[in-house]
């Protein structure tokens, strides 16, 4: 449940990063595939992915 709530919060804060997380975690896409779907460079995808993972880790840890 904590991940679901954190994803909802991320979507409100940064919808693009939330969409990336959905594509990577739940859609099973690679970074390059997700970058293509989102129309961003692979380097940007990597930065956004690192940020989103860290952000979610902090949010989920704070809810426990």
Question: Where do the protein language model's features map onto the residues?
Answer:
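Acidic, proline/glycine-rich intrinsically disordered inter-domain spacer in sigma factors
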Residues: 1-11
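Short amphipathic alpha helix immediately N-terminal
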Residues: 11-33
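Helix-turn-helix DNA-binding module
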Residues: 27-47
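Short, Lys/Arg-enriched C-terminal cap helix and immediately downstream tail that follows
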Residues: 53-64
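Generic, ordered loop/turn and secondary-structure boundary motif
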Residues: 2, 26-27, 52
């Amino acid at each position: 449940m904590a991940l679901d709530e954190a994803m909802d919060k991320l979507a409100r804060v940064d919808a693009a990063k939330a969409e990336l997380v959905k594509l990577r975690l739940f859609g099973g896409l690679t970074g390059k595939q997700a970058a293509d779907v989102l129309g961003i460079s692979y380097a940007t995808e990597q930065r956004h992915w690192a940020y989103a993972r860290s952000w979610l880790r902090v949010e989920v840890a704070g809810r426990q």
